Regions:
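12-transmembrane solute porter fold
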Residues: 7-30, 39, 43, 49, ...
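Helix-loop junctions on the cytosolic side of multi-pass membrane transporters
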Residues: 177-198, 219, 242-251, 448-458
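Interfacial helix-loop-helix linkers and transmembrane-helix boundary segments
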Residues: 68-69, 73-75, 131-133, 188-194, ...
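Phenylalanine-glycine-rich, low-complexity intrinsically disordered regions
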Residues: 184-189, 203-226, 241-245
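Transmembrane-helix bundle of Major Facilitator Superfamily
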Residues: 1-182, 314-316, 323, 327-329, ...
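Intrinsic disorder in cytosolic terminal tails and internal cytosolic loops
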Residues: 1-6, 450-473
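Loop-to-transmembrane-helix transition segments
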Residues: 193-202, 266-272
Length: 473
């Protein structure tokens, strides 16, 4: 089956939107030393320069998906791009660290509109038999942006100036907005209430959990602040589930999780991005602190992993129809675990870079096969009326997985090593990669629960519940 012109436009525009959002999750990492000098920022301020984006992005994803369903997916995608670009300009113009942190939080809010709506528009544009292929392209661009962020950030900060890592978003967004409004078809969504109680409970629960995960690395898991926010997040999360089970118009129809493919795909996606973010976070530092490369040099040496994501993720989308999603998810994550354990075993100061390439390629290849398969498993059996909420759920869990991956790997790292010397860093790096491998194996087990065929029907009862009147936006 051929892809028509409209579908190609949808694929291109939604992939660029995903690239913009995903790139900014990592792009500041290699520019932080320069930002610290130019803005006289403290270490805590640098931490929040990264975390403000992750925090607002993670907790507002479900809200973004719900707004798209109520107000129109295409329209709200354009609004999200505009907000993202305005915040990017504010980041570039920030006179101090506080202003930069505030602008990053707003940038995350724009991203929370862009990513779930991009995926829902893409999924709606393709028939079920072509969705796996389209999602493979989309996921490859997303993964490429995550891996390429440190390279681009280091190159721009070193060659031009740090504000340009944010200025780059502005012209892209100005071109994107009219193209989105002109080239993406008017979407169909649910004319339903926004479920404000669900929005408050979901946002509050996610905020508490993400805040605790981020703060625990700095002040300890036993601190009153972490325990309070973690407990509050869990309670609000439980209250959210209870509310959604009885709400007349739920933001997240809980019966979607009766689908094994949807439940397992979301679990695997959570673990996948925990692995990916943990790997990128520590590998970039290992190349600099442990092996002595500069920021740009470290980013460039991540290119083997970047290449696997660019090449294999689209291929995985095509393979799904022949080998099944279950094999791609479980096999890919098992391969990633092998590569991560390999890295942990060979890590040492003075390690020749060429010895690091094979395990990096193995891990990157495994992740590249699993990313589109997990996303496909979560979305392929979803009724059309629930595409927006399903994509918001998947992306929220994926983002929280990234935060969790960095937090758990950092906790393991701090237990065994530190930043006092290259040797101390390497001592902690090995166990951190071991923790990443453990997360990969958890995701591989979840992948075994995906039905062993190309697609799975929605769970009984889901279609009966999800028959709201669809209306064009």
């Amino acid at each position: 089956m051929r892809t028509d012109r409209t579908q190609r436009w949808v694929l291109a525009l939604t992939s660029v939107a995903s690239l913009m959002v995903s790139l900014d999750t990592q792009v500041v990492a290699t520019a932080l030393p320069v930002i610290r000098l130019r803005l006289h920022a403290s270490l805590a301020a640098l931490e929040w320069t990264v975390n403000a984006y992750t925090l607002s992005f993670g907790v507002l994803l479900l809200t973004g998906a719900a707004l798209g369903e109520r107000l129109g997916r295409r329209r709200m995608l354009a609004v999200g791009i505009g907000l993202f670009c305005a915040a990017s300009a504010a980041c570039a113009l920030s006179p101090d660290a506080g202003a930069l942190i505030a602008a990053r939080a707003v940038q995350g809010a724009g991203a929370a509109l862009m990513l779930p709506l991009a995926l829902s528009l893409l999924t709606a544009a393709f028939p079920p038999e072509r969705r796996a292929w389209a999602i493979g392209i989309f996921s490859g661009v997303t993964g490429l942006a995550v891996m390429g962020g440190p390279v681009i950030g280091g190159a721009v900060a070193q060659a031009i100036a740090w504000p340009w890592i944010f200025w780059l978003n502005v012209p892209i967004g100005l071109v994107m907005i009219p193209l989105v409004l002109a080239r993406i078809p008017v979407g169909a969504g649910r004319r339903a209430p926004l479920d404000p109680v669900g929005l408050v409970l979901a946002t509050g629960g996610a905020l508490g959990l993400v805040w605790a995960l981020i703060r625990a690395n700095g002040i300890g898991w036993a601190s009153p602040e972490v325990l309070t926010t973690l407990g509050g997040g869990l309670l609000l999360g439980a209250a959210f589930v209870a509310w959604e089970l009885r709400a007349a118009q739920p933001m997240v129809p809980m019966r979607l999780f009766r689908s094994r493919a949807f439940a397992a795909g979301n679990t695997a996606g959570f673990c996948l991005f925990a692995v990916l973010f943990g790997l990128v976070f520590f590998m970039a530092q290992f190349l600099q602190t442990g092996l002595g490369f500069g920021p740009l040099g470290a980013g460039l040496r991540l290119l083997p992993g970047w290449a696997t994501l660019a090449v294999i993720a689209p291929l995985a989308g095509s393979l799904a129809s022949r080998v099944g999603l279950r094999l791609l998810i479980s096999g890919g994550l098992a391969a990633a675990a092998v590569g991560l354990i390999w890295m942990a075993l060979i890590a040492r100061t003075g390690l020749p870079y060429w010895q690091l390439v094979p395990p990096l390629v193995v891990a990157g290849t495994g992740v590249s096969f699993a990313i589109p398969a997990a996303q496909g498993a979560a979305m392929i059996a979803v009724p059309s009326a629930a595409i927006g909420t399903a994509s918001g759920t998947f992306n929220t869990l994926r983002q929280l997985g990234g935060v969790f991956g960095v937090a758990i790997c950092a906790a393991v790292f701090a237990t065994h090593g530190g930043y006092g010397s290259p040797a101390a860093f390497v001592t902690g790096f090995g166990p951190a990669m071991g923790a990443c491998a453990g997360l990969a194996l958890v995701g591989a087990v979840a992948g075994l629960l995906v039905p062993g065929r190309r697609s799975a029907p929605a769970a009984p009862g889901v279609m009966a519940e999800l028959r709201p009147t669809e209306t064009a936006r």
